[in-house]
């Protein structure tokens, strides 16, 4: 599995190197001076590697399980590498990169190729990793000749191998956290996986539904509900993904790679956004308990052999009608009167009619 990336100061070149570090590393302080620049052939670094940087003011979060700190790239937009192969980095990595002003563009290319990924699991020669530097919280590092801005390294890695295993490798190694966006709502990713991918409407239809039903609440500065907040975040994430796909389509020269990245975003990430949008819109429309009950009912139905289940799957819109529990007691008075029954002419009515005829 891929190793984490940590910062390593090279006093000979007065630059910071990004080096892989094992997940067990927590940066225990050591008193030894900084050693020589390790050779590129090393696949990992010791657990206490880079801990000396704490003496120079590097924040503790550089060694936490949440992820290391790294250089803030002011002009970098994309870094690209290939597993087990050399890949020329795009020329957008200019000398303006903080902390690396003394290095040429060619040095930057070799620098990242040698230091960035060294302990990635062998997934094949065709697997490409697209790494986009987004940003994060900043810290100060007091060093000569001037203070440098630092921040958490925040990466989005889109792997061209659309498998669950590859996706976990691409993302799980960065944070090491088990985050389920449905957990606080009583559901889980596994529960949503009961529904097939073609069950969820298109993102355009879901966005139109959210806009038609909850636009005022979504645009409101007030906190309406956790579902409204989650909807806002999902809509914003999809907008950023669309910007990313548009940028890749415009700047990636290789048509095959461009198609792979755009297709991966639309299919894999698009499915996750569709699930999120559907879940929160449905919870706001039908109620969370009804949606959870529907997920369980659908999961039971689809996992039952066809010979032993009803021909039609449960429908969320009709589920509340079959699960309403009415209280005992007098039923409320109906507003619409019942149709009058035709009365037979009784002797009393006949007598009244005879009297009227006499008058």
Curated annotation (Swiss-Prot):
GO biological process, one term: microtubule-dependent intracellular transport of viral material towards nucleus
Biased segments, Basic residues type: 325-352
Segments traversing the membrane: none
InterPro entries for the chain: Hepatitis_B_virus_capsid_N, Hepatitis_core, Transactivation_prot_X, Viral_capsid_core_dom_sf_HBV
GO molecular function: DNA binding; RNA binding; structural molecule activity
GO CC field: host cell; host cell mitochondrion; host cell nucleus; T=4 icosahedral viral capsid
Region entry Disordered, spans: 25-48, 312-359
HAMAP family to which the protein is assigned, alphabetical: HBV_HBEAG, HBV_X
Name of this protein: Putative X-Core fused protein
Source species: Hepatitis B virus genotype C subtype adr (isolate Korea/Kim/1989)
């Amino acid at each position: 599995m891929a190793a984490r990336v940590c910062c390593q100061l090279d006093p000979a070149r007065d630059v910071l190197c990004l080096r892989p570090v094992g997940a067990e590393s927590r940066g225990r302080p050591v008193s030894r001076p900084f050693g020589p620049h390790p050779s590129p052939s090393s696949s990992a670094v010791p657990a206490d590697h880079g801990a000396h940087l704490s003496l120079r003011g590097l924040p503790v979060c550089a060694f936490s399980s949440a992820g290391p700190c790294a250089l803030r790239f002011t002009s970098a937009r994309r870094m690209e590498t290939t597993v087990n192969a050399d890949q020329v980095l795009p020329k957008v990595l200019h000398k303006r990169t903080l902390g690396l002003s003394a290095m040429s563009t060619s040095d930057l290319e070799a620098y990242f190729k040698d230091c960035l990924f060294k302990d990635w699991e062998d997934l094949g020669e065709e697997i490409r990793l697209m790494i986009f530097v987004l940003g994060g919280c900043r810290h100060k590092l007091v060093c000569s000749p001037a203070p440098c801005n630092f921040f958490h390294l925040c990466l989005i890695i889109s792997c061209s191998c659309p498998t669950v295993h590859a996706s976990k490798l691409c993302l799980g190694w960065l944070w090491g956290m088990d985050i389920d966006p449905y957990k606080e709502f009583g559901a889980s990713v596994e529960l949503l996986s009961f529904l097939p991918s073609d069950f969820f409407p298109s993102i355009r239809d879901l966005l139109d539904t959210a806009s038609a039903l909850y636009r005022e609440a979504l645009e409101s500065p007030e906190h309406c509900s956790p579902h409204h907040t989650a909807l806002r975040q999902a809509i914003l994430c999809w907008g950023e993904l669309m910007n990313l796909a548009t940028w890749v389509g415009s700047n990636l020269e290789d048509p095959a790679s461009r198609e792979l990245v755009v297709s991966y975003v639309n299919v894999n990430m698009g499915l996750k956004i569709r699930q999120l949008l559907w879940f929160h819109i449905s919870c706001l429309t039908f109620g969370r308990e009804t949606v959870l009950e529907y997920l369980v009912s659908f999961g039971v139905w689809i996992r039952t052999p066809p010979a032993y289940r009803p021909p039609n799957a449960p429908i969320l819109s009709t589920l509340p009608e079959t699960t309403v529990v009415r209280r005992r007691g007098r039923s409320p008075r109906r507003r619409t009167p019942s149709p009058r029954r035709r009365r037979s002419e009784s002797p009393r009515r006949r007598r009244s009619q005879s009297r009227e005829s006499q008058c």
